[in-house]
Amino acid sequence: MARVCQVTGKRPMSGHHVSHANNKTKRRFLPNLQSRRFWLESENRWIRLRLTNAALRTIDKNGIDVVIADMRARGERI
């Protein structure tokens, strides 16, 4: 399973570890993914989403129904 947020689309980024001596080695910055279950009142069922902490705050702000409607408009299957 890919490390991608289902709501925001955030993916791993690449960058450098930088030591005190300014030596650089490649590394990956991974998104803060969480697996959460949400109750969809309109469909009377649970859905499971793999999303970032930023997406959780978006759901708190806008509501799960609005976020799911946006995902479906993008063509994602829920």
From Swiss-Prot:
Record's compositionally biased regions (Basic residues): 13-25
Pfam family membership, one: Ribosomal_L28
GO CC annotation: cytosolic large ribosomal subunit
InterPro entries with a match to the protein in the record: Ribosomal_bL28 (IPR026569), Ribosomal_bL28/bL31-like_sf (IPR034704), Ribosomal_bL28_bact-type (IPR001383), Ribosomal_bL28_sf (IPR037147)
Alphabetized UniProt keyword annotations: Ribonucleoprotein, Ribosomal protein
Location of region: Disordered: 1-25
Gene Ontology BP terms: translation
GO MF, any single term: structural constituent of ribosome
Coiled coil: none
Xref: Gene3D superfamilies: Ribosomal protein L28/L24
Keyword Ribonucleoprotein: yes
Highest taxon listed in the record's lineage: Bacteria
Family of the protein in this entry: Belongs to the bacterial ribosomal protein bL28 family.
PANTHER family for the chain: 39S RIBOSOMAL PROTEIN L28, MITOCHONDRIAL (PTHR13528), LARGE RIBOSOMAL SUBUNIT PROTEIN BL28M (PTHR13528:SF2)
UniProt name for this protein: Large ribosomal subunit protein bL28
Species name: Nitrosomonas eutropha (strain DSM 101675 / C91 / Nm57)
Lineage, opening ranks: Bacteria, Pseudomonadati, Pseudomonadota, Betaproteobacteria, Nitrosomonadales
Gene this protein is translated from: rpmB
